[in-house]
Amino acid sequence: MKHNTLRAVFQFSFFIGICTFIMIAGYSYQINYNQRMGIFYGGNITFKKVPKVVIYTATPFFDVPIENSILRDCSEKIKNSCTVTSNNKTFPIADAIVFHSRDINETKLSFFNKNRRYDIPYIMMAMENPFFAGLTVYHNFFNWTMTYRTDSDIFHPYGAFVKSYVPAEVNYSEIWNSKTKETLWMVSNGNAQNKRKELVEKLIKKGMSIDLYGQLYKKEPAECPRRRGPPGCDVKFHSPYKFAIAFENSNCKDYVTEKFWKKAGIYKTVPIVMSRKIYRDLGIPDSMYIAVDDYPNLEEFVHHIQNVTSNEEEYMKYHKWRKQFKIVDTNEGNIGFCQLCQKLAGYKRKLVPHKVYENLNSWHSTSTCDNSFATRFL
């Protein structure tokens, strides 16, 4: 009888324990579910359909909030399963946090260090090269990088070219007939590290015809003032030029910005760059641009430009790529965020290994740049 009583007490205690465990587990699940639905800390975050991936952008991009519209050119599958928001209340439920390097301040850094979430990646987004990225010392803070460099965790280029499935119809005669001027240089930043201003002015002294516009030269096209012109005026302004200077403010690994992509793309000019290696390393066709370092001196370079300027057959060789390829303008950041959504989906399935950058500055450093190029010609 005594043994039966003890057995009954044990069974009852075990039963109570199991019930308690189920209640706690169920409650924990409900809390987690409610948080995923945006019901936490008295918040009022709501999604019509709970996304599989939530990306919280903790900083703006040059003071402009990064919102879900950044995904507008992604596939429907990505848009239906991923949300990008700058709403601070999504911090506890986010699957990743993105910081733009030029918009991080000490207050934000202190908050996210103090309230660190170790279960999700902190992502550094930097579209500027190391000289202008605005990075200070971030030790063991970031897990992923999202930059223009191909070795970033998320490749976030300014532009890209893709092969056309069907050869495009290109009116070469129309392109040639629209070209009535030689070369344009539109430039705003005079604080370049690579002496591009000195190189351009040396080219002019060597006989190259270059029209100079932009903040650096305090000259704006009357028909298309910066940020105030009518839609499409930039295309109309650039279209008469055969060539356009596309020198970046620094010569860094993989650093090819809209200066190149727009000139070759919608402007239909031939970009002139400093060094071929940077562009060739990205797989950009050699015939899409002209590189100064293909020539032993500036005299021979200028002679080539002048020869091509007056020769339709030679000039149109730099447009033949248009039949097979097209340029995708990713300057609005969509390609990078599309890829980020995809990677995070894999991360949630534990397909992406956890990592942390011990010293981000050593990765995104000026050692990836070579600004000595122009000096050999000056």
From Swiss-Prot:
Inhibited by Cu(2+) and Ni(2+), and to a lesser extent by EDTA, Mn(2+) and Mg(2+). Its cofactor is Ca(2+). GO terms for cellular component: Golgi cisterna membrane. Gene3D superfamilies: Glycosyl transferase family 10, C-terminal domain. This is Alpha-(1,3)-fucosyltransferase fut-5. Residues 1-7 are cytoplasmic. Optimum temperature is 23 degrees Celsius. Vey low activity at 37 degrees Celsius. One of its GO terms (biological process) is fucosylation. N-glycosylated. One of its GO terms (molecular function) is metal ion binding. Belongs to the glycosyltransferase 10 family. Its EC number is 2.4.1.65. InterPro entries: Glyco_tran_10_C, Glyco_tran_10_N, Glyco_trans_10, GT10-like_C_sf. It is an enzyme of class 2 (transferase). It is a single-pass type II membrane protein. The keyword Transferase applies. SUPFAM superfamilies: UDP-Glycosyltransferase/glycogen phosphorylase. The gene is fut-5. It holds the Pfam family Glyco_tran_10_N. Glycans are attached at residues 44, 88, 105, 143, 171, 307. Catalyzes the addition of fucose in alpha 1-3 linkage to GalNAc-beta-1->4-GlcNAc-beta-1->3-Gal-beta-1->4-Glc (LDNT)acceptor. Unlike fut-1, does not add fucose to Man-alpha-1->3-(Man-alpha-1->6)-Man-beta-1->4-GlcNAc-beta-1->4-GlcNAc-beta-1-Asn (M3), Man-alpha-1->3-(Man-alpha-1->6)-Man-beta-1->4-GlcNAc-beta-1->4-(Fuc-alpha-1->6)-GlcNAc-beta-1-Asn (M3F6) or GlcNAc-beta-1->2-Man-alpha-1->3-(GlcNAc-beta-1->2-Man-alpha-1->6)-Man-beta-1-4-GlcNAc-beta-1->4-(Fuc-alpha-1->6)-GlcNAc-beta-1-Asn (GnM3F6) acceptors. Its main location: Golgi. It comes from Caenorhabditis elegans. Residues 29-378 are lumenal.
